Design a protein with these regions (language model features):
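Repeated scaffold domains used in trafficking and secretory/extracellular systems
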Residues: 1-9, 47-65, 98-114, 158-170
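Structural hallmark of WD40 beta-propellers
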Residues: 10, 66-68, 119-120
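Short loop/turn segments that connect beta-strands within beta-propeller blades
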Residues: 32-36, 81-85, 140-144
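Beta-propeller fold detector
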Residues: 37-54, 87-97, 147-158
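C-terminal structured domain segments
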Residues: 102-111, 118-148
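Blade-level signature of beta-propeller repeat domains, shared across WD40, Kelch, NHL, RCC1
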Residues: 132-170
Length: 170
């Protein structure tokens, strides 16, 4: 298993790699919300057509639809695992960040029940290993299609390497 996260309709989305063929990826969808009746597996989908998944540094799963994002060093892609296992480029780091040496270190899809932006914000952590500086990009998304609204991305500075995020209520 490469990655697993709770997502849409309370199902778990598990990215799996074939140990005998590292280019072969699958997405397993499981329903752990009920008693084990021997049929918790909801689906198995090929993700081998999702370009550069072998180079993924981070993943995020949606809770408003069946979204699966993965990030390489400078790009965020959406794996269309239910549509033949293809990928769609959703975001490329701005040229100035790439030229400065920043790389993607983390993805986090905001999934806090009852909050206004639930399922509508993708956070991207970026890190420059030379300067040891990190930034956080807040990216509004269309929660049903996965499109990232590039013209509305906000950048927050003043971090070190961001490896994980969580929401804390007051």
């Amino acid at each position: 298993m490469v990655y697993a996260e709770h997502g849409f309709e309370k199902k778990w989305y598990c990215v799996m790699r074939d140990p005998a063929n590292v280019a072969e990826y699958s997405v397993y969808v499981c329903d752990f919300s009920k008693m084990d009746d021997g049929n918790r597996g909801v689906g198995k989908y090929s993700a081998s057509g999702c370009t550069y998944m072998k180079d993924a540094k981070a993943f995020a799963v949606g809770n408003r639809s069946e979204l699966l994002y993965y990030a390489t060093t400078t790009e965020v892609k959406q794996c269309n695992f239910k549509d033949g296992g293809t990928s769609t480029l959703r975001y490329t780091l701005p040229t100035e960040l790439i030229q400065a040496g920043y790389e993607i270190s983390m993805l986090y899809l905001f999934k806090v029940s009852g909050k206004e932006n639930e399922g509508k914000l993708l956070y991207i952590g970026v890190y420059n290993p030379t300067t040891e500086e990190g930034k956080l990009l807040e990216c509004p998304i269309v929660e049903t299609s996965g499109e990232i609204l590039k013209d509305k991305v906000k950048t927050y500075d003043g971090f070190k390497k961001i490896t994980h995020m969580a929401y804390k209520s007051k």
